[in-house]
Amino acid sequence: MEPIKNLPRLCRTLGYEFNNIELLIQALTHRSAANKHNERLEFLGDSILSIAISDALYHQFPKATEGDLSRMRATLVKGDTLTIIAKEFKLGDYLYLGPGELKSGGFRRESILADAVEAIIGAVYLDADIEVCRKLLLSWYQERLAEIKPGINQKDPKTILQEYLQGFKKPLPDYQVVAVEGEAHDQTFTVECKISELDKVVTGVASSRRKAEQLAAAQVLELLNK
């Protein structure tokens, strides 16, 4: 757990500065750690995320059917996606957990990470308003919204790889940014993807970290399918 003094660093990562930092602390507090925990904020954030993503998809895909919109929304708000977002934000470093959860590695537990993302959404809403929260969510989901398309199969390479490894009870992939080149407005990211099933390290290179991770995951899947 990072000290409270380092929460401004998390705020910069999230792209939002809290007026009331206590709301962020509560959003990061698991029920095992204190009576004032994040479950109510999680409840609030879940609803806000759903309406924000529904609204974005409705306007982005004016010809999509209700079924396609529902499937795309489910892909974007499901626990696996929220867990990936949490790991991108390194939320596990900031969680307040009780001794039992801490000992059992709760800071890596996917359900706890996903719940913390929803709790932070609820905290932002209470700290500001629905419009500020909506704009923040759109910034978090910008690349995912750009990539998603109507259709039955909504799974991206990272999700497919994660589910494949989970099915065999194997460790999740380890993604590491090994190089960032270029100016701030025109950067190139190189990401390594390591899994226990392969001896070799696979890399992806793209204009964003997320895209590079997706490319690396896609290459790993190709190797696994050979």
Swiss-Prot record:
PROSITE patterns in the record: DS_RBD, RNASE_3_1, RNASE_3_2
Domain DRBM residues, every copy: 156-226
Binding-site residues, Mg(2+): 42, 115, 118
GO BP of this protein: mRNA processing; regulation of gene expression; rRNA processing; tRNA processing
Top-level EC class as recorded in UniProt: hydrolase
Keywords associated with the record: Cytoplasm, Endonuclease, Hydrolase, Magnesium, Metal-binding, mRNA processing, Nuclease, RNA-binding, rRNA processing, rRNA-binding, tRNA processing
Source organism superkingdom: Bacteria
Reactions that this protein is recorded to catalyse: Endonucleolytic cleavage to 5'-phosphomonoester
Subunit structure: Homodimer.
Protein name: Ribonuclease 3
Originating organism: Shewanella frigidimarina (strain NCIMB 400)
Gene coding for it: rnc
